[in-house]
């Protein structure tokens, strides 16, 4: 039976996810939310979504599955908003946040006791590119798509999500939300701090050593590439996993 999928956030992740869902489920209706008119237009023109809105609450009651592909702070705010809306019975809400413990905690607090299912998730894929214009149906291929089950997640719900996302060609795995945040602090968040710190330090160094920029080559680019990522998004990620990241910094010392 055809379903209605609502993707809130039509950036690189959300738009690429829409393409993947369309690949295996062309009969599903995909609704999209984004504040940017340009992003909505691109998603519609490329056939990623069927309808678009800049009013988040307007499409939520129509959806069988709602996926929040937004910055962490906004994801949390929208989970709180969804708790007060008249949603379909048994609707699945999921997210794509880079940290999980805070999101899962809010979901369990606000969605408990309702006919709502929640599945925390983090697709371990991305790029320094951003926006719907950079969407790629193969973005998630062979990448880990991590689910962080909670008290609001049943085995049947997990299976439904895996079927829905089959067109992403990702590798699904399940892990506790807090353990997810500990592991990603080491292999994702802390490396980003190192890359950004190296870029900042090099900029100051180059003020007195003019050949610095000219000599910086492959090794330097490899180490600092991730520092190009969108700073607002990374500020949200780092602040939401602050204590665990501070532990990694202490370990590094």
Whereabouts are the PLM-identified features?
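NAD(P)+-binding Rossmann beta1-loop-alpha1 motif at the extreme N-terminus of oxidoreductases
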Residues: 1-61
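Residues at the starts of beta-strands that form the adenosine-phosphate
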Residues: 4, 29, 117, 144, ...
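Conserved short alpha-helix immediately C-terminal to the canonical SAM/SAH-binding motif I
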Residues: 38-39, 74, 100-103
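Rossmann-like NAD(P)-binding element
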Residues: 57-87, 91-92, 98
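Rossmann-like NAD(P)(H) cofactor-binding subdomain of soluble oxidoreductases
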Residues: 80-133
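Internal alpha-helical scaffold of NAD(P)-dependent oxidoreductase catalytic cores
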Residues: 139-226
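Interdomain hinge/lid region at the active-site interface
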Residues: 208-253
């Amino acid at each position: 039976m055809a379903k209605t999928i609502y993707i809130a956030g039509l950036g690189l992740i959300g738009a690429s996810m829409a393409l993947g869902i369309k690949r295996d489920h062309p009969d599903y209706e995909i609704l999209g939310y984004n504040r940017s008119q340009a992003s909505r237009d691109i998603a519609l023109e490329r056939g990623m979504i069927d309808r678009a809105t800049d009013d988040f609450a307007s499409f939520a009651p129509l959806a069988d599955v709602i996926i929040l592909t937004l910055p962490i702070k906004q994801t949390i705010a929208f989970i709180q908003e969804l708790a007060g809306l008249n949603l379909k019975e048994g609707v699945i809400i999921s997210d794509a946040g880079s940290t999980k413990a805070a999101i899962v905690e809010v979901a369990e607090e606000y969605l408990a006791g309702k006919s709502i299912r929640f599945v925390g998730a983090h697709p371990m894929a991305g790029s320094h590119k951003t926006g719907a214009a950079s969407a790629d149906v193969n973005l998630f291929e062979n990448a880990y798509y991590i689910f962080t089950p909670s008290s609001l997640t049943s085995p049947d719900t997990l299976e439904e999500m895996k079927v829905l996302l089959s067109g992403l060609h990702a590798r699904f795995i399940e892990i506790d939300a807090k353990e997810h945040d500990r592991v990603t602090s080491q292999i994702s968040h802390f490396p980003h701090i190192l890359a950004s710190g190296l870029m900042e330090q090099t900029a100051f160094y180059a003020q007195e050593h003019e050949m610095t920029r000219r000599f910086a080559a492959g090794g330097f680019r490899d180490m600092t590439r991730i520092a190009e990522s969108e700073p607002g998004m990374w500020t949200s990620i780092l602040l939401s996993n602050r204590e665990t990241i501070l532990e990694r910094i202490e370990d590094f010392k």
